[in-house]
Amino acid sequence: MKKLMTTIAAAVLVATSVQAQVQPNVLGENHAMVRVEQGKKYLLLPVQEKEENAHIAVLNGKNEMVKRLNVRLAVDKVDYFVPLELNQAMLLDITFQGDRRTTGAVKDFVCWKEIKHSDTFDTTNREKFRPAYHHTPVYGWMNDPNGMFYKDGVWHLYYQFNPYGSQWENMTWGHSTSKDLIHWEAQPLAIESDWLGTIFSGSCVTNGNDVVAFYTSAGHHQTQSMAVSKDGGLTFEKFSGNPILTSDAPDFRDPKAFWNEEAKVWNLILAAGQEMRIYSSKDLKAWKYESSFGKEYGNHGGVWECPDLFKIDNKWVLLCNINPGGPFGGSATQYFVGDFDGKKFTCESMPKVTKWMDYGKDHYATVSFYNAPANRRVVLAWMSNWQYANQVPTKQFRSANSIPRDLGIFKYNEETYVSVKPSEEMLAVRGQKIKKPTETCEIVIDVKGSATIELSNAKGEQVMMNYDAQKQTFSMDRTKSGDVSFSEAFPCVTTAPTYGSIRQLRLFIDRCSIEAFDSDGKMVMTNLVFPNEPYNIIKVKGGKATIFEINK
């Protein structure tokens, strides 16, 4: 994976970094000002994760507000650095949080000694749990995938990103591109916060040569905004008429727009409290409310958000991500199958029926690529859970996306379900057969009746999987998988219905994750794991395993 900024060796970084020797002007117990000359490209801010956020107002030479950000500035220890781009001299107006901020203490904070000027920012990986073939941010926090589209042979992935730390904050649209859905190249920030608020989740469509982004502006109220790109999605200009949609509904967010070829109209679906609202437009600017869906349908154990609406074969599918309320606690993706006429979605199932797209603990914010080739419906998910996403044992970065998945339709007992299979691109990185599991591999298991699979290492850490042919269930037990200490919600057993018999399982292992699929796409389960050593032992009862390298 290429780096977000200039990639260099640590030794070079030392040679090109200059200690800023910042002298804070302490104005009170929690307040300081720092003037920073330009000199270098970046100001590297030292972060200490256990500290509370410092609120930083960035002003230019005319004392005009440039941006606001929250950074956990280091008090007595530096965990890592984050870059603040210096395109001019700046004044940082910093307000610390907490009750131990005496004037004397603020002057002695280690951040003033450790702040650096630099023309480069080192993104060399220092994390043993960084996945090898899953998309991750090169540094910082990531959650929901946003604005995904395909154009001119390139897959575009935007995502909820914190450029100033590895916990949720400062929501911005990060951006990565790929030609094969596996190898991703990080791009500059796509959309940053403004007077309307930080940038929450949304979508992109292509309209002629333009790429049009729709997103939630998260300020005092959540409103919907748009921006247009004239260069294929690399840079965006915000619409002067923002916001384009407002409401007094709680949790009014995450617009997903698409062209409805059957109705010959643009549609947009977004979350509004415990329902999804559907709009139509002829010009992408003026939107007409058409209908709502969901008050009596599905699971309402948490906030509804991150919707999607699309057609597969002759069925329309509405995705609804919910947090909390998942089948094993925390966040998960439910879906509804039915019909849509451009104005109203009609679910074909009974109101109390709940269908889950993935029965693991770590699969959320699932959305699809707009304009995928060959009528494919390709999705990515955020591979984590809001119960512990901020606590997982990484620091340089947090969170990854799932492998790409193709959706289909199948019937079982007169109900219609969505099938989920690894995208065909995963076969292109399948390497030679090997004898033992490694930290990055694919395991194909041919099953005859019920089966058990045990993955383990020399430390006794293990993941147990069980397929019960009679009960038609598949389960995964990660209670002894490695480091489970960071959250009481992490050690668990997840269980999925298989909707018939399983003939073959495909397991994708990538350092901190296991994704399990049955070959027909009727069962999928995604779980994080944090073993202290890679699982290099496999025991299978009731089947035969073939192990493949993953060519990274």
What are these regions (language model features)?
Residues 22-64, 84-86, 90-101, 121, ...:
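Beta-rich accessory regions
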Residues 22-33, 64-84, 107-146, 165-168, ...:
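Surface loop/turn signatures of beta-propeller and other carbohydrate-active proteins
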Residues 45, 94-95, 144-164, 187-189, ...:
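Hydrophobic core segments of beta-strands in well-ordered, beta-rich domains
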Residues 54, 171-173, 222-224, 274-276, ...:
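Repetitive beta-architecture junctions, highlighting loop-to-beta-strand starts
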Residues 164-166, 197-198, 220-222, 275-277, ...:
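Flexible loop/turn segments at secondary-structure boundaries
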Residues 174-178, 225-232, 279-283, 331-342, ...:
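Beta-propeller blade signature
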